Amino acid sequence: MGKIYASLKSIASYIPPTCISNVDFEKTLDTNDEWITKRTGIKTRYFALPSQQTSDLAYEAGKKAIERAGIEPKDIDAVIVATLSPDYLTMPSTACITSFKLGIENKAAFDISAACSGFVYLLSLAKSFIESGTYKQILIIGAEKTSSVLDFSDRSTCVLFGDGAGACVIGSTNDEKAAILGVNVSANGRYQDFLCTPRVHATFGATQAQEKQSFIQMKGNETFKVAVKTLVSEVKEILNTHHINPQDVSFFIPHQANLRIINAVGENLNFTPEQIVVSIQKYGNTSAASIPMAMNDLYEEKKLKYGDLMLLDALGGGLTWGSALVHFGGTN
């Protein structure tokens, strides 16, 4: 029997129903479409309904990913969700709720907290679980209802984010050309205040000022500088480790945080425009969901084929960051 590799078998996403354009923000904020587009590359984003929770978004993406993998919910051994906007503050995990909604019971389910790097962290965990023989089929989901943690009076943050979910089934293969080749993850708490919610949760009777501490806060300029330098270094490292040249990568799929960061990293690494996948103009920054949502766009546009090599990278609150080299092991 040959070596067992972890393999990305399917990809799916869920986009919430409410589309919010930059023009919509002009009605309530001192901002405009030109200002937002120039600084971020974002034109629209989608927000969940008030009645929808993060687990609802995760469920929709997860259900489709399972179907596309050609398996049943009962075949899933573990459900892992990455999110910064869970259904409950501390417990139960969004993964537990999502797995129940999917009809997956008496299997492992837990959340991870790595902010915008969450999906890369999910891949690292899933790869280890599969290749160690611990599990055979894992459902990983990046899901966010960032609209629940945004201060809609703060134009520096609320225009940046969107809601959504992306899911993958990770299984096994003997074919290295369908394998998750490698995943690197790292973090440095030195930068913890660059992206944060200073107060985890406002207690009952909290003042308005205390409530605002429950929303996302960001030091944009500082984050930009660290992001470009860190991501370029991270991508170079994983390419060198696996002896892969940039031109051998089918698609470079970065976390969709800011178009200026995406372009700066892509240009520094000499990727062509055809290699770089950009979806931020449609969805905004969907945190842990952004990479699988961008990947799903490729899939649904029939551009993603068996064996295609994807290079992923992300940086998020923590600060956390990571990169991955992933062959697509599914069918399209």
Swiss-Prot record:
One of its GO terms (biological process) is fatty acid biosynthetic process. It is an enzyme of class 2 (transferase). GO terms for molecular function: 3-oxoacyl-[acyl-carrier-protein] synthase activity; beta-ketoacyl-acyl-carrier-protein synthase III activity. The keyword RNA-binding does not apply. It catalyses: malonyl-[ACP] + acetyl-CoA + H(+) = 3-oxobutanoyl-[ACP] + CO2 + CoA. It comes from the Bacteria. Residues 256-260 are annotated as: ACP-binding. Its main location: cytoplasm. The active site is at residues 116, 255, 285. Transmembrane segments: none annotated. InterPro entries: ACP_syn_III_C, ACP_syn_III_N, FabH, Thiolase-like. It is found in: Cytoplasm. Gene3D superfamilies: 3.40.47.10. GO terms for cellular component: cytoplasm. The keyword Protein biosynthesis does not apply. Its EC number is 2.3.1.180. Keywords: Acyltransferase, Cytoplasm, Fatty acid biosynthesis, Fatty acid metabolism, Lipid biosynthesis, Lipid metabolism, Multifunctional enzyme, Transferase. Pathway: Lipid metabolism; fatty acid biosynthesis. Homodimer. The last Arg residue of the ACP-binding site is essential for the weak association between ACP/AcpP and FabH. PANTHER family: 3-OXOACYL-[ACYL-CARRIER-PROTEIN] SYNTHASE 3 (PTHR34069), BETA-KETOACYL-[ACYL-CARRIER-PROTEIN] SYNTHASE III (PTHR34069:SF2). Catalyzes the condensation reaction of fatty acid synthesis by the addition to an acyl acceptor of two carbons from malonyl-ACP. Catalyzes the first condensation reaction which initiates fatty acid synthesis and may therefore play a role in governing the total rate of fatty acid production. Possesses both acetoacetyl-ACP synthase and acetyl transacylase activities. Its substrate specificity determines the biosynthesis of branched-chain and/or straight-chain of fatty acids. Belongs to the thiolase-like superfamily. FabH family. This is Beta-ketoacyl-[acyl-carrier-protein] synthase III. It comes from Helicobacter hepaticus (strain ATCC 51449 / 3B1). The lineage of its organism: Bacteria, Pseudomonadati, Campylobacterota, Epsilonproteobacteria, Campylobacterales.
